[in-house]
């Protein structure tokens, strides 16, 4: 609207730009014989121009405005279509004299006064006839600055108006004031008259000259004292009348009186504004650092003794006199001596600001000094505050000094801080820092900015990034160099106690919370006692361990370069008190109210000691210990684990902005990359060279470590689904071609579990030895790194390196790995690649991650051990491995046929413990490859049968087993775990009794473990039902001919028949089976086996666990 005060007139009136564009407009109008008369630059400029040209007086502009409003209301149907919004509200706004108007009002005025409007807008451009009503009279206007209208007259108007004006003033002074004007005009020299005439060339030049003079001399609102330019102001000693009167009396000069009156009132308002601004900026008693008192340019220090509208009275310290300076030059920012503890002031924008303590000095040297900062919290140094490394403990009254780099940062910040009353200056400065961050924003923009900031902080809290929670709080550092996080620890130095003073605990906690959310500190070198230095590269030197009350005892010392065996790690040496009340320096006093984990938590698979090259903050019940030298120290309890939520938090950011998107590693070209092998070299030489792959697995590791309660599937699967959705929506996006292994890459066949390719590895791996055929129980603590490693099928087929199943690993860390047999080749099974997530024959139906994940959920990528009952149903023996089985018959895996008889007979405790212990014992005996002797007859029969078949050599397994496995391999469309032995033909069974003992006792033993004793009084009915279904008597004689009586079963469970039934006549009609015949294993009653192994590979033992 209004142009800025004191701005050059060309900017205000130039229709297209700066001052040089304004002069061509005046020249163009003169060329056309026209003259532009300036009009007051306010909202009534149009009505002023029309009032002068129609009513011959600008003072009647309000009358013209009200007449226009009435005309618009009376002719509403003509103008309402051109008004946005409510027409009545628009007319109500027009009643304000400062409301700017436009085309609608010009059309109304044209119809009201029956005059067409012609408007000049640009130089050398024909004017615009905005109203074409064909009225004979015209109103000429000049449009400039996008909203301002000036009057355009013929150039003869200026000359005639100058003559009329001189006659009018001459009559006024001679007849009214009784002044002989003719003598005064004759007494003036010709040069002075010419100067008066030249000074009138353009009113805009007068305004511009005045503005330049003001800008040069009126610094900070103070005007130069005396009459430096007497020709511009008031009466001169040589002239009896003012310059303005003499100008009005000159017949050759036209004086724009209306514009001069508006300009004078504008300058008076400017003086009042300066006075208010000076009152806000200065007060009596403030200290001025640099005051220019004479013309030689010398600067001196002074105290302000008076604040007035124009000139301020100051007392010079060097001269000992009071002066009214012409101006106050602010000192350079580098030499400011900022005293903390006072509020800053907010003068007008563009002016330099000083702290009021810079002028008055510290009033109370014993008052606590707080750290000022003009930067918002997001830009502050992590430890922005008072530099306390340069003062001694005795000079308590001396002010702390700041480095020049910090002053430069302070000078870059705009001066947008207001001054507060003295009673408010004791408040914490943090509030002003936060307010300055949002200064100048509308309420909507401020709320939007705060919402974005809160969303970002929430995302940091969810991801528990190390950047969001530093190892050391910077606010506690800025308070005092020896201040500890524990309030019970006494302060060591005297100046810290002096500075402690009246520090408010709540404000300190708030600063801790803010800094711990924003800052991230690192320790770069060993600190010195009672020394605190904060460098500009955001690296802090922490107080030495002597500041702490006591040190936490570290575990057994080891050399840094020593290899750390991780197969049997010791539990973390952290006392229970640390879990209950951790005293971490950066932990805020008020933690989020999330459900925390149990006190017995611990990172899974983390060794007891890790050599740490930097200063490691170890938590203890009393203090924090900083160790700057390279020593193995206990793994610290992470703050993330203390506040780890039990359930996943909601996703706040877009899936496409997630650092783990698209849920799988991509190379630099954007193609899907195969997961790299484990990095075993301590130097990191075997890390991937591709930064994208390294970044993905780094982010995945940070998130998995920060959120141990979340399965990686819970946040990788939605990202993968989003990527697949993007591929469907945008066909140009290439669909990734998935490799065979969608989770882990198969390890090199030459590398075994016990041999590490790198000599300086972090850890060495070796298979756990079995004692007396049993695997040792898992230790009560975090599982070893050796357990979750994925073993490729090549190693499994060779019979070594198989890992035992540990129940603790499943319960603590579900969903971390896939089973070993997951790498089955997809060739020949499907034309299309399988998705890494979602429904597939490996993982089963996988829904989108719900808000709560149970521990036993079939969608999880559970670790791939065949002993894991949750994953038995999904285990498939790869076709390339089926023909290379070299394991003895009695050591067949549970997932292929049935439970091992040797395991059942040799470990009677497994019948009580369930499938977990049984599986672990069975696999351990299989790994050792030993055939344990047993006193029972069934075990001896198995040994005899297996001994004869094992002599045939590798690559020639028993015919019975291979035929049972190879035949359904080609008939099944999908890899499924089934009871393959039921499809063989009767003539292939050479010894039915022995073969039956091979297949049945395992199932019988499982049945005997879980099934209650039941009577078999319905046997005859079941047999009759079988006969009615079309079975021959030969089938009945073959199947049940050698059945044992109930007294000979040797078990209280529902045993069943110990022999394999023939399959030829059992198939029945061709369409009765999904797989060319039933595969149900019949029992005493003839009912189908309840644990159908096509659907549930877990058998009755697993069902018994969950019932």
From Swiss-Prot:
Residue stretches making up the OTU domain: 34-155
Positions with biased composition (Low complexity): 392-403, 473-486
Enzyme active site: 42, 45, 148
Main localization (coarse): cytoplasm
CDD domains, A to Z: OTU_OTUD4 (cd22794)
Positions where Phosphotyrosine occurs in the chain: 120, 438, 459
Effect of disrupting the coding gene: Mice are born at sub-Mendelian rate.
Composition skew (Basic and acidic residues), residue ranges: 419-431, 495-528, 963-994, 1060-1079, 1089-1107
Bias (Polar residues): 226-236, 1032-1041
Compartments reported by the entry: Cytoplasm; Nucleus
Annotated region described as Disordered, given as residue ranges: 195-239, 322-431, 470-568, 918-1107
Keywords from the named record: Acetylation, Cytoplasm, Hydrolase, Immunity, Innate immunity, Nucleus, Phosphoprotein, Protease, Thiol protease, Ubl conjugation pathway
Activity regulation: Phosphorylation on Ser-202 and Ser-204 induces 'Lys-63'-specific deubiquitinase activity.
Biological process according to GO: antiviral innate immune response; DNA alkylation repair; negative regulation of interleukin-1-mediated signaling pathway; negative regulation of toll-like receptor signaling pathway; protein K11-linked deubiquitination; protein K48-linked deubiquitination; protein K63-linked deubiquitination; proteolysis
Cellular-component GO terms for this entry: cytosol; nucleus
Residue stretches of biased makeup (Acidic residues): 195-206
InterPro entries hit by this protein: OTU_dom, Papain-like_cys_pep_sf, Peptidase_C85-like
Sequence positions bearing Phosphothreonine: 131
Annotated segments matching region Cys-loop: 39-45
Enzyme Commission code(s) on record: 3.4.19.12
Modified residues (Phosphoserine): 126, 128, 166, 199, 202, 204, 340, 442, 544, 895, 1000, 1005, 1016-1017, 1042
Modifications the protein undergoes after translation, according to the UniProt entry: Phosphorylation at Ser-202 and Ser-204 activates 'Lys-63'-specific deubiquitinase activity. Induced upon stimulation with IL1B.
Bilayer-crossing regions: none
Assembly and interaction partners: Interacts with MYD88; the interaction is direct. Interacts with ALKBH3; the interaction is direct. Interacts with USP7; the interaction is direct. Interacts with USP9X; the interaction is direct.
Job of this protein: Deubiquitinase which hydrolyzes the isopeptide bond between the ubiquitin C-terminus and the lysine epsilon-amino group of the target protein. May negatively regulate inflammatory and pathogen recognition signaling in innate immune response. Upon phosphorylation at Ser-202 and Ser-204 residues, via IL-1 receptor and Toll-like receptor signaling pathway, specifically deubiquitinates 'Lys-63'-polyubiquitinated MYD88 adapter protein triggering down-regulation of NF-kappa-B-dependent transcription of inflammatory mediators.
Protein name from the UniProt record: OTU domain-containing protein 4
Species assigned in the record: Mus musculus
Name of the gene encoding the protein in the UniProt record: Otud4
